[in-house]
Amino acid sequence: MANIKSSKKDSIKSRKKKKLNASKKSMIKTLIKKVKIAILSGDKLKSELAFSKIQPILDRYSAKGLIHKNKAARHKSNLKCKINAL
């Protein structure tokens, strides 16, 4: 544990940020699952609507560095290909 006051504050801040980032990553996974479920149901309109919700979120979080930009691009590409195949 840190002894210096600023180090203690940094430690607290990093723990809070870690919880927030974990929450955001969990949200991304949940939204991706919703898109995949919509694709499996075969409803193109529903899957496109779900995809339109997740696309800007992936872009935003990849720009902020929460997820890697290539990972965001891969998810968007794979989901869009599956939607177009419907």
Swiss-Prot record:
Keywords: Ribonucleoprotein, Ribosomal protein, RNA-binding, rRNA-binding. It comes from the Bacteria. One of its GO terms (cellular component) is small ribosomal subunit. GO terms for molecular function: small ribosomal subunit rRNA binding; structural constituent of ribosome. GO terms for biological process: translation. Residues 1-23 are annotated as: Disordered. Pfam families: Ribosomal_S20p (PF01649). InterPro entries: Ribosomal_bS20 (IPR002583), Ribosomal_bS20_sf (IPR036510). Belongs to the bacterial ribosomal protein bS20 family. Binds directly to 16S ribosomal RNA. This is Small ribosomal subunit protein bS20. It comes from Buchnera aphidicola subsp. Baizongia pistaciae (strain Bp).
